[in-house]
């Protein structure tokens, strides 16, 4: 009967309980920590009294008087590509802006 018990004990694998010393020391210190009691007087020097901010000044717009605004409204509008005189050079073809120069002497 003794041999049967010895054989049954050896059939089970056992793991060694490993201790994590750092984790245990940390949890022990956290549990032992007692926070100091604070009163309202302790916070007086640490907190500034609240005061409402001052109202912001409105922005100043350049040329806000009526004469400057009227002059701006009456100013001619510049449009790109528009010519002022009839004697100007004829308008370029739309495809001229992307013209590739043909290379000479290239054999295909």
Swiss-Prot record:
Segment annotated as transit peptide: 1-19
Q: What is its main location?
A: mitochondrion
Query: What ranges does the record list as Acidic residues composition bias?
Result: 93-108
Compositional bias ranges of the Polar residues kind: 81-92
Bias regions of kind Low complexity — which residues? 47-60
Pfam families to which the protein is assigned, alphabetical: ATP_sub_h
User: Can you say where in the cell this protein is located?
Assistant: Mitochondrion inner membrane
Record's family?
Belongs to the ATPase h subunit family.
What function is annotated for this protein?
A: Mitochondrial membrane ATP synthase (F(1)F(0) ATP synthase or Complex V) produces ATP from ADP in the presence of a proton gradient across the membrane which is generated by electron transport complexes of the respiratory chain. F-type ATP synthases consist of two structural domains, F(1) - containing the extramembraneous catalytic core, and F(0) - containing the membrane proton channel, linked together by a central stalk and a peripheral stalk.
Assembly description? F-type ATP synthases have 2 components, the catalytic core F(1) and the membrane-embedded component F(0), linked together by a central stalk and a peripheral stalk. The central stalk, also called rotor shaft, is often seen as part of F(1). The peripheral stalk is seen as part of F(0). F(0) contains the membrane channel next to the rotor. F-type ATP synthases form dimers but each monomer functions independently in ATP generation.
Its name, as the record gives it, is: ATP synthase subunit H, mitochondrial
**What is the species listed in this Swiss-Prot or TrEMBL entry?**
Yarrowia lipolytica (strain CLIB 122 / E 150) (Yeast)
């Amino acid at each position: 009967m003794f041999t049967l018990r010895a054989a049954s004990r050896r059939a089970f694998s056992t793991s060694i309980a490993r201790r994590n010393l750092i984790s245990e020391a940390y949890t022990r210190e956290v549990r032992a920590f007692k926070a100091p009691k604070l009163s309202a007087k302790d916070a007086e020097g640490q907190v500034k009294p609240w005061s409402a901010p001052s109202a912001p000044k409105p922005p100043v717009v350049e040329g806000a008087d009526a004469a400057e605004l009227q002059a701006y409204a009456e100013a001619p509008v510049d449009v790109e590509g528009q010519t002022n005189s009839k004697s100007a050079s004829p308008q370029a073809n739309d495809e001229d802006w992307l013209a590739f120069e043909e290379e000479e002497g290239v054999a295909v």
